[in-house]
């Protein structure tokens, strides 16, 4: 069999390297490997390669060593060798060996005779001997022996003289490695098979097919020994040969057994790689086959993922299924199951189409492809069924529409082809004649053809479901075809002109008719094999004929190129003319929807989803066939590319593949972490990490900043370290695109050192995963170490370094080695490592005294980099030291904050640890804390000073008994102090040094004196202390006392009548800074008020006799005027002060130096004269009482985040309060929701439903109001872009709980040319509303509240404006013209105001009060208008109802509250929650609103603590140092300040006038969000939260005379603002009810207190006059206007007739104007005592008691 196949190729040269056996293999029962031909070729190639590598060597080296034979070869016999012959390793029987010659000379070998070796070999030379067969047995080969005299000397003669009788077999290659033995055995077995010895090869069961002879065994052994040297044999083979060196059969048996186990896996892989499916078999069977293969491979450890499996499956799809390649090629995450769903869908569709056709017989061996047979046909590639070719697809499908002209193309006369042809007619080109056939052109062909077409023939197409032809001369019974849609393999439409019949007249004189479609738009005339099968005709490609099922041959098949053809000579021509067919056009009904249109209509879904939905009828109205899918594959939607753009995917392992060529320390990853805030200056704020790609060795370096020179120093260090320590050069450094890496300095450094920087792409942090993961791991370790050890935060980098040391020593699960091992370093000696934070005792080698202890408690951090020592932290010295002189402290707590220092014997160390703590805690305060059994959780870390030292005079007085302290009490206090365990603070001073172990020079802190009042919650008493400051102005405002005030400031003497006091420093909490308070006796604690005995405090005798009475200024007027002034003050909500005797100052204050005022600083309580005058004796409060006086930031408030962060040192901001006015671009706080927030992504189902309902309500209202012109839509290109306004929907929840949607225009981007900037949108002023409410209470008015729905839409718009339609209309490319004033337009408010104003005046009989917009009145009703909200006031409720009826005639008016009840009625009017009972009272508050809003601000509240007594305390200054923040952090804090101050301003403006000073001061610092400012803001919000239930209380006035009384109380605080600006404040009262307040910084810099007071009064007069006019318009009663101030000098100037005083004053002009205003407007100027001046809360921070005293009458 083998020789027969070889004889068919006589032209192959025996000496050629490619002369390999390509025939089929021997019978399967003799071939246990079942190796395919492709594998044989691989083996032959490997053999050829091995043989070609053999070179000519000396004879002594040609024979391999044989350890199994002890006898050497005879010396006379030349050893076998590979001589210098061209035909290497080829042998034949023509070359005989000497008789009886033994190849190895072994005595046991069977003797050989000539011609007894394999005749299939030809020896390369006479000296190269090969194994022989014994002559007694005869040759086992089936071929005869060649002639003996035929010898070949070289390749040329071999090629020329070779005869067909010589048979050549390629020998196996030489074995060169034990690892190559499995592959070598395969070639060895193939060698035996080709030598006709396949029967002796063991089968699967280990036994040969036939017995093996001795000669064959000898041949087997000798061949094995030649080509398999013993030194290259595997161990298991050597083990077999050591037992029996001739047992080659056992080696073959075991090798085959091993190969069988690998064959299944190899077959599965080959099968999976060569999958083919076209629908000819059931889809279920194909799926089962594929899944079984994948499962077997997965079970054997060969994992085939979904992506690879899907690619292999799709590569083998053909026919109808090939389309899945294009629809699936972009789906990276598809699964095998999803792919088979699509395959099943197409298969089921095919089966349904076949069932609808007539049954016909088909040859299953020939028909392999099925295609769709329904109307929407497909023309896939032609599949030629040539069993000897694997690539049978049409290669020229792209030329289907490019038919070229070829008029001289020859054709084939198929009559000369025999019916019994067994070989395919192969035409290489049109001019190639094969087997004597002649090509002639068909006479019926009148159509141009392409170059690769066989003219005059029909192309046999197994994939086409219909027959198509280009020429009309063969179509019978042609007719138009409006209902047939045909697409090609690329799913492109093929227009069809006509349909008819194609009639064949075959060789057996039978006629057959097929349906044919006419189209000139194809490259070939196609004959569908499916339609032939329908008429019982099949194509047999083995015989190359068309035949019927009974075997009758009808016509021959010609193979030309890659395709098969049938001659057109069998077609019968028709009489139809060509123009008749070509004039047939497609009906209009065949028009299809373009795919881009459907893609856009269906929300830009992908083509596969759309087709699947159409197939399953999930979309109705049209079918899949109604869509033109021809462009679906190649269509790129630009909107999808933009809207669905994603980042590229990171392929796992791609980095390793790219970087695997680098050696250790050649590729580094680096990244920077930081900053870490709130650290001392000596502690690093950043660290930079490096990771080696190969070894994963890590380095970390501390950084104090990210400047380029700092980064450059680190790079220089790490490169030098790697070069010197590891003898390596860094080639690449990967880093992100931070400015610290991309700067020019570092770039030049890397370029100079030949290092390639590898940057990540934009927004691709995942590409920097190595460095990012390292930083995350180190930070996790750092947080854990600090938490476990309790060490302070400034040691954070020590924790990082400790973690790096340990991580470099731990083995990686992937590499099974540590980074140190990869780097060639020794492992970490754990005996030298201590737990992080381990308590130790360090030897002090330089104690202060020889008798002092020499041990200092400390905490171990990490091994030293620079020595064999250990880095240890010493809390008592606030330093870290590098030492080996330490002892581990056994059995002690490991945490610093749990360390029991009292258990140690180092008393001196204990004193050092607690020194700073003792500096700010007095003994009496500890005694009070113990007496009350109060545990203070206050953290003193912010109050610690570096090495504080108590002033000796203060400490001596603090611990010595005084006259006011009983000795027994002092003794008890001392005992309690000694028993108190004082713990070292967690945070340290910012000036800690880590390099010097010696204590720094100690400094003392200067005690400060401040004024502190008691709270409601304390219970303990503390004295009020005057805060001494430079007094530049007297309190009585007389200029003659200024010099005396200055003398007092420098005076060292006080009154001698006071009890001695001792000043001790205390901790600052609750909004106050460090203060010094005097110790007093209990008898002194009841003393409250002390007057400053200075010349500027001298009062008239009347005031001295009765301080608690208000004393009007006496003039020359009558007693009636004096009574008027008294009546003005009579019913005001002023505090009631009991008379108290004056007290004197203590002598102890004589020793205290004056403290200079920081008058250039912004202060929450500057040092004005009225503020400097404070009380001395008051209740003294213990330290623990301050624990709820919150003065900590958000970070330090929450105990879980005690380690706060300091601002990074990146950007400096200068504190300029004036910058607040310049900034106009601060984004307002957005309280509304967008559509996606309210509906699309809203997870609250109930809220979402309410917003949807509101949305539909708004849309209906827009349509109802005819907001836009619905008759015409405009194209966007036709309209000027300036007149196009963007629009959007916004959603919010109203105060009453209803949900509202509003369609608004984007007025913020409206062009200035589209509106009149002079028009204004007016709303009612808050003072007008408060005035109307106050008059309503006094006159028993009814209050009715209305709302006009969609108010702006009632106003027409004059300008020509266009908007984009709402989204639900689906007309994004169109515009509509506005007809109404849409919300959001800049002119809408003004248009609505003019519309409603005109209607109220003309239709309702109202008139607008002059100077007060949106306040309308008539004789019975007053209306306050705020956009669409109306508040009606009238004495008769029917009058309100009449107005309501008229409003409803024009507007959609809704009654919110009619107000007809005589009981208490609750209103919600413009944000105010009002409780009103006619004729009795009115309460104004915002409790519900604040309860809802404040928690949403994310402010750290303290709900469980005691309430604050005041929003701030006096004596606290805002530090004006430069603020250093990162840009993002700065913007975040400014935004937070905006939210907090915005809410506070809203509340203060509405009714909390007592907070206006604090709000105004903090509002000036919105752009300066320092930690201190944020702390104050949090404290303010906390106070608002604690007092959210407070209300502004009004009671109905009961005047003696029917008059209205309007009073303004004024006050000023001189020079307590930056740049010596003064704070002024005014409170307005109507009939004793506070209706408004104002606190602001004076616009002018005043030179004295009197000038500041004059400025404050002059600022209040204009508003006072306007309010007077409004009151007279609304209530026709006489009005009395009063002006109250506590500055007598101001009053004397105003009422003085001596004009000479004004000439010597800077404020003379203002004073003159003020005097004219007072006299011209009949203002009554009165004096009010400072202690009763409620306007004092508008100008300065007050002590808690004073604050409550001045506000509890009107806010409670």
Curated annotation (Swiss-Prot):
Domain spans labelled Integrase catalytic: 660-835
Any single GO BP term: viral translational frameshifting
Binding site for Mg(2+) 3: 1611, 1653, 1686
Active site: 461 (for protease activity)
Catalyzed reactions per annotation: DNA(n) + a 2'-deoxyribonucleoside 5'-triphosphate = DNA(n+1) + diphosphate; Endonucleolytic cleavage to 5'-phosphomonoester
Region spans: Disordered: 1-93, 126-173, 352-421, 956-1088, 1142-1173
An annotated Gene Ontology molecular function: DNA binding
Reverse transcriptase Ty1/copia-type domain mapped to chain residues: 1339-1477
Cysteine disulfide partners in this protein: none
Domain topic, free-text comment: The C-terminal RNA-binding region of CA is sufficient for all its nucleocapsid-like chaperone activities. Integrase core domain contains the D-x(n)-D-x(35)-E motif, named for the phylogenetically conserved glutamic acid and aspartic acid residues and the invariant 35 amino acid spacing between the second and third acidic residues. Each acidic residue of the D,D(35)E motif is independently essential for the 3'-processing and strand transfer activities of purified integrase protein.
Protein name: Transposon Ty1-BR Gag-Pol polyprotein
Gene: TY1B-BR
């Amino acid at each position: 069999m083998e020789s027969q196949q070889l004889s068919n190729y006589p032209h192959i040269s025996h000496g050629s390297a490619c002369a390999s056996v390509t025939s089929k293999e021997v019978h399967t029962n003799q071939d246990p490997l079942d190796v395919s031909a492709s594998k044989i070729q691989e083996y032959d190639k490997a053999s050829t390669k091995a043989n070609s590598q053999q070179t000519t060597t000396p004879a002594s080296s040609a024979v391999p060593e044989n350890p199994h034979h002890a006898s050497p070869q005879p010396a006379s016999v030349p050893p076998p060798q590979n001589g210098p012959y061209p035909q290497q390793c080829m042998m034949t029987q023509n070359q005989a060996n000497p008789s009886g010659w033994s190849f190895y000379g072994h005595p046991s070998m069977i003797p050989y005779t000539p011609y007894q070796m394999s005749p299939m070999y030809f020896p390369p030379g006479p000296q190269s001997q090969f194994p022989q067969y014994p002559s007694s047995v005869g040759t086992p080969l089936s071929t005869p022996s060649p002639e003996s005299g035929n010898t070949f000397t070289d390749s040329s003669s071999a090629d020329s003289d070779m005869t067909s009788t010589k048979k050549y077999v390629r020998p196996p290659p030489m074995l060169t490695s034990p690892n190559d033995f499995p592959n070598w055995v395969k070639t060895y077995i193939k060698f035996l098979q080709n030598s006709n010895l396949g029967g002796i090869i063991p089968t699967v069961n280990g036994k040969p097919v036939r017995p093996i002879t001795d000669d064959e065994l000898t041949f087997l052994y000798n061949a094995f020994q030649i080509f398999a040297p013993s030194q290259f044999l595997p161990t298991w083979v050597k083990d077999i040969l050591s037992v029996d060196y001739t047992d080659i059969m056992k080696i073959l048996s075991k090798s085959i057994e091993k190969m069988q186990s690998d064959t299944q896996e190899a077959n599965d892989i080959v099968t999976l790689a060569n999958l083919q499916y076209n629908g000819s078999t059931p889809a279920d069977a194909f799926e089962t086959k594929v899944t079984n293969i994948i499962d077997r491979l997965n079970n054997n450890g060969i994992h085939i993922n979904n992506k690879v499996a899907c690619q292999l499956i799709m590569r083998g799809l053909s026919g109808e299924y090939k389309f899945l390649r294009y629809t699936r090629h972009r789906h990276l995450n598809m699964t095998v199951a999803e792919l088979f769903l699509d395959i099943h869908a197409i298969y089921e569709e095919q089966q349904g189409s076949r069932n609808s056709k007539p049954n016909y017989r088909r040859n299953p061996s020939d028909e392999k492809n099925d295609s769709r047979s329904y109307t929407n046909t497909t023309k896939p590639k032609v599949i030629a069924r040539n069993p000897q070719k694997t690539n049978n697809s049409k290669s020229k499908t792209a030329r289907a529409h490019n038919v070229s002209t070829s008029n001289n193309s020859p054709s084939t006369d198929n009559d000369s082809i025999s019916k019994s042809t067994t070989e395919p007619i192969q035409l290489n080109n049109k001019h190639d004649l094969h087997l004597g056939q002649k090509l002639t052109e068909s006479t019926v062909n009148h159509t141009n053809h392409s170059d690769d077409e066989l003219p005059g023939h029909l192309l046999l197409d197994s994939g086409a479901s219909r027959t198509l032809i280009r020429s009309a001369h063969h179509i019978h019974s042609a007719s138009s075809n409006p209902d047939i849609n045909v697409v090609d393999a690329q799913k492109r439409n093929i227009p069809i002109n006509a349909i008819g019949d194609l009639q064949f007249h075959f060789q057996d004189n039978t006629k057959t008719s097929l349906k044919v479609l006419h189209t000139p738009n194809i490259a070939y005339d196609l004959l569908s094999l499916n339609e032939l099968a329908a008429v019982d005709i099949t194509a047999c490609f083995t015989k190359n004929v068309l035949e019927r099922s009974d075997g009758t041959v009808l016509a021959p098949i010609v193979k030309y190129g890659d395709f098969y053809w049938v001659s057109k000579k069998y077609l019968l021509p028709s009489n139809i003319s060509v123009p008749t067919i070509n004039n047939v056009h497609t009906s209009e009904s065949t028009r299809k929807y373009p795919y881009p249109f459907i893609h856009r209509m269906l929300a830009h879904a992908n083509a596969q989803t759309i087709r699947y939905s159409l197939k399953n009828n999930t979309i109705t109205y049209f079918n899949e066939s109604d869509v033109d899918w021809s462009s679906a594959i190649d269509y790129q939607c630009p909107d999808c590319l933009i809207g669905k753009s994603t980042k590229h995917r990171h392929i796992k392992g791609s980095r390793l593949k790219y970087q695997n060529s680098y050696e250790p320390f050649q590729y580094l990853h680096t990244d920077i972490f930081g900053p870490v805030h709130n650290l001392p200056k000596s502690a690093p704020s950043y660290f930079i990490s490096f990771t080696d790609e190969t070894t994963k060795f890590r380095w970390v370096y501390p950084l104090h900043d990210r400047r380029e020179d700092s980064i450059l120093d680190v790079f220089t260090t790490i490169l030098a370290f790697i070069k010197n320590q590891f003898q390596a050069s860094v080639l690449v450094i990967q880093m992100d695109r931070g400015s610290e890496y991309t700067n020019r300095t570092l770039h030049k450094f890397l370029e100079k050192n030949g290092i390639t920087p590898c940057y990540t792409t934009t927004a691709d942090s995942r590409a920097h995963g190595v460095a990012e993961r390292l930083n995350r791991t180190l930070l996790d370790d750092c947080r854990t170490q600090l938490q476990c050890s309790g060490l302070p935060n400034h040691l954070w980098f020590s924790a990082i370094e400790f973690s790096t040391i340990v991580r470099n020593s731990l083995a990686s699960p992937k590499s099974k080695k540590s980074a140190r091992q990869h780097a060639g370093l020794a492992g970490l000696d754990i005996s030298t490592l201590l737990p992080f934070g381990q308590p130790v005792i360090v030897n002090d080698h330089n104690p202060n005294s020889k008798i002092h202890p020499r041990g200092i408690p400390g905490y171990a951090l990490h091994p030293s980099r620079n020595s064999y020592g250990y880095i240890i932290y010493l809390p008592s010295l606030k330093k870290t030291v590098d030492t080996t002189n330490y002892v581990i402290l056994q059995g002690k707590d490991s945490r610093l904050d749990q360390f029991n220092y009292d258990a140690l014997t180092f008393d001196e160390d204990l004193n050092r640890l607690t020194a700073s703590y003792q500096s700010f805690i007095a003994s009496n305060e500890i005694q009070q804390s113990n007496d009350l059994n109060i545990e203070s959780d206050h953290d003193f870390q912010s109050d610690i000073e570096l090495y504080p030292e108590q002033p000796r005079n203060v400490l001596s007085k603090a611990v010595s008994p005084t006259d006011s302290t009983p000795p027994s009490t002092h003794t008890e206090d001392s005992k309690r102090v000694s028993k108190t365990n004082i713990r070292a603070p967690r945070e340290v001073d910012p000036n800690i040094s880590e390099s010097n172990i010696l204590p720094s020079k100690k400094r003392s802190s200067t005690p400060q004196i401040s004024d502190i009042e008691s709270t409601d919650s304390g219970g303990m008493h503390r004295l009020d202390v005057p805060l001494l400051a430079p007094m530049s102005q007297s309190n009585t405002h007389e200029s003659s006392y200024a010099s005396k005030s200055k003398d007092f400031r420098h005076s060292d003497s006080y009154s001698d009548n006071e009890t001695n006091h001792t000043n001790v420093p205390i901790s600052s909490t609750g909004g106050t800074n460090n203060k010094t308070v005097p110790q007093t006796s209990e008898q002194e604690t009841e003393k409250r008020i002390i007057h400053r005995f200075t010349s500027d405090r001298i009062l008239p005798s009347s005031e001295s006799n009765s301080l608690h009475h208000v004393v009007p200024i006496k003039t020359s007027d009558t007693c009636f005027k004096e009574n008027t002034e008294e009546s003005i003050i009579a019913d005001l909500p002023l505090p009631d002060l009991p008379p108290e005797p004056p007290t004197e100052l203590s002598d102890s204050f004589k020793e205290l130096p004056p403290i200079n005022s920081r008058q250039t600083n912004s202060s929450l309580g500057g040092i004005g004269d009225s503020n400097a005058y404070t009380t001395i004796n008051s209740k003294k409060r213990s330290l623990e009482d301050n624990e709820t006086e919150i003065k900590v930031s958000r970070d330090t408030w929450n105990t879980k985040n005690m380690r706060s962060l300091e601002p990074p040192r990146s950007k400096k901001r200068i504190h300029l309060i004036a910058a607040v006015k310049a900034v106009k671009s601060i984004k307002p706080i957005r309280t509304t929701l967008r559509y996606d927030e309210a509906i699309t992504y809203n997870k609250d189902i109930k809220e979402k439903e309410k917003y949807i309902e509101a949305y539909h309500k708004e849309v209906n209202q827009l349509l109802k109001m005819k907001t836009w012109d619905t008759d015409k839509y405009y194209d966007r290109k036709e309209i000027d872009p300036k007149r196009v306004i963007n629009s959007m929907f916004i959603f919010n929840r109203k105060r009453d709980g209803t949900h509202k949607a509003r369609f608004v225009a984007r007025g913020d981007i409206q062009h200035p040319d589209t509106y009149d900037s002079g028009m204004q949108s007016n709303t009612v002023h808050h003072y007008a509303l408060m005035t109307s409410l106050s008059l309503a209470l006094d006159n028993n008015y009814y209050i009715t509240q209305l709302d006009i729905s969609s108010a702006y839409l009632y106003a027409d718009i004059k300008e020509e404006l266009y908007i984009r339609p709402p989204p639900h209309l689906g007309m994004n490319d169109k515009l509509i013209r506005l007809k109404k004033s849409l919300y959001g337009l800049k002119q809408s408010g003004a248009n609505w105001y003019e519309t409603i104003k005109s209607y109220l005046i003309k239709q309702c009989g109202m008139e607008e009060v002059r100077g007060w917009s949106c306040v309308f009145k008539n004789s019975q009703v007053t209306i306050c208008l705020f956009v669409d909200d109306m508040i009606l006031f009238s004495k008769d409720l029917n009058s309100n109802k009449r107005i309501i009826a008229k409003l409803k005639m024009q507007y959609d008016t809704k009654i919110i509250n009619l107000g007809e009840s005589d009981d208490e009625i609750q209103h919600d009017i413009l944000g105010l929650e009002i409780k009103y009972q006619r004729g009795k009272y009115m309460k104004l508050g915002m409790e519900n609103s604040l309860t809802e809003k404040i928690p949403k601000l994310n402010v750290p509240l303290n709900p469980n603590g005691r309430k604050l007594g005041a929003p701030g305390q006096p004596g606290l200054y805002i530090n004006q140092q430069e603020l250093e923040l990162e840009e993002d952090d700065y913007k975040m804090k400014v935004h937070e300040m905006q939210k907090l101050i915005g809410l506070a301003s809203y509340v203060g403006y509405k009714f909390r006038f007592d907070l206006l000073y604090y709000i105004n001061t903090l509002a000036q610092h919105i752009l300066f969000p320092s930690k201190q400012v944020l702390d104050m803001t949090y404290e303010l919000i906390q106070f608002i939260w604690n007092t959210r239930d407070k209300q502004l209380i009004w009671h109905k006035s009961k005047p003696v005379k029917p008059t209205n009384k309007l009073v303004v109380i004024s006050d000023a605080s001189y020079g307590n603002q930056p740049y010596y600006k003064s704070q002024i404040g005014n409170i307005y009262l109507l009939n004793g009810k506070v209706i408004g307040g104002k606190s602001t910084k004076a616009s002018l810099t005043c030179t004295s207190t009197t000038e500041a007071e004059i400025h404050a009064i002059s600022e209040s007069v204009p508003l006072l006059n306007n309010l007077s006019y409004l009151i007279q318009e609304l209530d026709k009663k006489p009005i009395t206007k009063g002006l109250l101030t506590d500055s007598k000098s101001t009053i004397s100037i105003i009422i003085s007739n001596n004009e000479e005083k004004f000439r010597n004053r800077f404020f003379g002009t203002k004073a003159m104007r003020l005097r004219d205003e007072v006299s011209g407007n009949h203002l009554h100027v009165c004096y009010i005592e400072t202690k009763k001046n409620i306007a004092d809360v508008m100008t300065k921070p007050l002590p808690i008691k004073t604050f409550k005293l001045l506000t509890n009458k009107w806010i409670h």
